[in-house]
Regions:
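Sec-dependent N-terminal signal peptides
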Residues: 1-8
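Catalytic-core environment of secreted peptidases
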Residues: 20-42, 96
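Active-site-proximal helix/loop segments of hydrolytic enzymes
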Residues: 1, 13-17, 21-24, 48-195
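Glycine- and acidic-residue-enriched helix-capping/strand-helix junction motifs
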Residues: 38-52
């Protein structure tokens, strides 16, 4: 019985941390774009940081044999509805939306799911946050669930048909977070791909 219990525990642990399988499809959403610049810090625009990271994540996933879908691959505006339609129509297995946060003061990285998210959404978000933490963050602000009826129940999480999360990759308004983002961009992309 003890042997069976240990074997079962090992199987459960392996399943929780199993990497994405070759042949699966991940939809990568670079937030904002075109006239929608997102948050800013001087001449630094969130839309540009999101796209740089999205392209790096795409390359890392492809190197692992994982199919990718980009909601945008250049500086164009794509509506939230069209982002979700792309992921749903192409039957992505996972959806991750990449963003930068902003505030008068504040730093750190956080990942959002829906309030009362299905276990797969939470697992995806927790695995990504753990992997990013291993690279290094100014502050781990954790995995957060949106509150029904408010803006933090992000449209893309609500309207995609697969496990999804929205990652806020540091505060664009914080110089320390920007330095980490620039220094670790490739490592963050690899961490997301491995999560």
């Amino acid at each position: 019985i003890l042997t069976f219990a240990i074997f079962t525990a090992l199987l459960v642990t392996a399943a929780v941390h199993m990497p994405k399988k070759s042949g699966n499809t991940v939809c990568i959403d670079a937030g904002h774009g075109g006239y929608d610049v997102g948050a800013t810090n001087g001449e630094r625009y969130e839309k540009d940081d999101n796209l740089r990271l999205a392209k790096a994540v795409e390359a890392e996933l492809k190197a692992r044999g994982i199919n990718t879908i980009m909601t945008r691959s250049d500086d164009t505006y794509v509506s939230l509805e069209d982002r979700c339609k792309t992921a749903n129509k192409k039957k992505a297995d996972l959806f991750i939306s990449l963003h930068r946060n902003s505030a008068d003061s504040g730093c750190g990285f956080e990942i959002w799911t829906l309030k009362n998210s299905p276990p797969d959404d939470l697992l995806l978000a927790e695995n990504i946050m753990d992997a990013l933490g291993e690279v290094g963050l100014s502050k781990n602000r954790g995995v957060k669930g949106g509150i029904a009826g408010n803006g933090n129940n992000y449209y893309v999480n609500k309207n995609t048909d697969m496990p999804s999360c929205l990652a806020e990759m540091g505060f664009i308004t914080d110089d320390g977070d920007n330095a980490l983002f620039d220094k670790n961009l490739q490592s963050y992309a690899a961490a997301i791909a491995d999560a």
